[in-house]
């Protein structure tokens, strides 16, 4: 196991995408559990999905005196530069991104702005945090995605695998983030760690994700479409496991070393964070149905069969995602392990409470 070399206590931590699903959960965990921490959250609160959920997440963070929220877009360089100048963050976690594989097919511009230009602005700000001999950013942690594996046939997906065949623009932007981070780590000695998240789910999640969208449709009496005739497998990973992994990774920055060429050996790492246990989409839907009935979101006599339609695979989709989490286990002694039923129960109970208000 690696020894932690970055303390979170008393630090100023910048979290981009703080009103997002993972971002808000990460802010909450840090503010709850870390002594003297100051969390600066930035989010543009786009209407890609229901802003009420984002506002609700921010409301739950506002009670912490160590939390400061800034509404702004990471694609705006001045906003980011001003933020770094004013607060001098010691740790940066970049979770702001235009998410969604299918949306990238119809709205490519927003992916270029947020995922490429936005991330470039973060890298530049990290680079200049060392100007004038300042200590600067100790560790940049950023979200990559399991989508970088594209249609790779070899499973489980390993971070040693070649990932040069993305099947969506979203995946291509995430692979680009890893390449950009590597270049900046090499040139400017910025310790950076990329995390390839695998199908994150849980309470107060993203309404565009399958489990949430299925629930909305079933409640409205609409038909749900199950892609690839139900033969897709996904490495569903509960949000608490993702956040636990992020917090552990934040505390070990890749070490700065000098290579034989006299230049820095890039202090750069990439890890998978997934459940290491892919679930068949039909099994997933069956468990979701049972938990929605249990939480009284749907009646016991609901006719699920009449509301299911098996359809072909969609453009940009892949048949399976499956994370090899061995390096994460070896380096941090941690592996996501929340069973699907436990996670979906937490979601169903949240949904029942949230929509009954």
Enumerate the language-model features and the residues they cover.
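N-terminal Rossmann-like NAD(P)+-binding domain of SDR-like oxidoreductases, especially those catalyzing
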Residues: 1-200, 279, 287, 320, ...
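Active-site helix-initiating loop/hinge in glycosyltransferases
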Residues: 18, 202, 206, 235-238
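Generic alpha-helical secondary structure signal
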Residues: 91, 179, 209-213, 283, ...
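Proline-centered turn/helix-capping motifs that create local helix->coil transitions or kinks
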Residues: 132, 141, 150-154, 189, ...
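Residue-level recognition of oxygen-bearing side chains
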Residues: 79, 110, 117, 162, ...
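Short coil/turn segments at alpha/beta junctions that flank glycine-rich nucleotide-binding fingerprints
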Residues: 187-191, 207-208, 253
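C-terminal substrate-binding subdomain of Rossmann-fold SDR/epimerase-dehydratase oxidoreductases
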Residues: 1-3, 29, 33, 37, ...
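A glycine/serine/threonine-rich, flexible loop-to-helix segment
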Residues: 155-156, 207-215
């Amino acid at each position: 196991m690696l020894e932690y070399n970055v303390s979170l206590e008393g630090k100023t931590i910048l979290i981009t995408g703080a009103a997002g699903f993972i971002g808000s959960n990460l802010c909450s965990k840090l503010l709850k559990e870390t002594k003297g921490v100051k969390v600066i959250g930035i989010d543009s609160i786009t209407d890609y999905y229901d802003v009420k959920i984002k506002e609700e997440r921010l409301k739950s963070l506002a009670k912490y005196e160590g939390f400061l929220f800034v509404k702004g877009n990471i694609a705006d360089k001045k906003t980011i530069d001003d933020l770094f100048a004013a607060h001098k963050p010691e740790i940066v976690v970049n979770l702001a991104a235009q998410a969604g594989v299918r949306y990238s097919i119809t709205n490519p511009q927003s992916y270029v702005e947020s995922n490429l230009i936005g991330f470039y602005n973060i890298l530049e700000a990290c680079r200049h945090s060392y100007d004038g001999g300042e200590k600067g950013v100790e560790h940049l942690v950023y979200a990559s995605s399991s989508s970088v594996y594209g249609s790779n046939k070899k499973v489980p997906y390993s971070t040693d695998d070649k990932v040069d065949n993305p099947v969506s623009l979203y995946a291509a932007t995430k692979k680009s983030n890893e390449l950009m981070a590597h270049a900046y780590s090499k040139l400017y000695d910025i310790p950076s760690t990329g995390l390839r998240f695998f199908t994150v789910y849980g309470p107060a999640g993203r309404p565009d994700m399958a489990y949430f969208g299925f629930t909305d449709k079933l409640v409205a009496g609409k038909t749900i479409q199950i892609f690839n005739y139900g033969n897709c497998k996904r490495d569903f990973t509960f949000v608490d496991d993702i956040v636990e992994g992020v917090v552990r990774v934040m505390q070990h920055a890749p070490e700065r070393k000098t290579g034989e060429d006299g230049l820095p050996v890039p202090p750069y790492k990439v890890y998978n964070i997934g459940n290491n246990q892919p679930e068949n989409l039909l099994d997933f839907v069956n468990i979701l149905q049972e938990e929605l009935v249990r939480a009284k979101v749907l009646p016991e006599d609901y006719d699920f069969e009449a509301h299911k339609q098996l359809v072909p695979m969609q453009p940009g989709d892949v048949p399976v995602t499956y994370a090899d989490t061995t390096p994460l286990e070896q380096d941090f002694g941690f592996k996501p392990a929340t069973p699907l039923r436990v996670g979906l129960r937490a979601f169903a109970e949240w949904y029942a409470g949230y929509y009954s208000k």
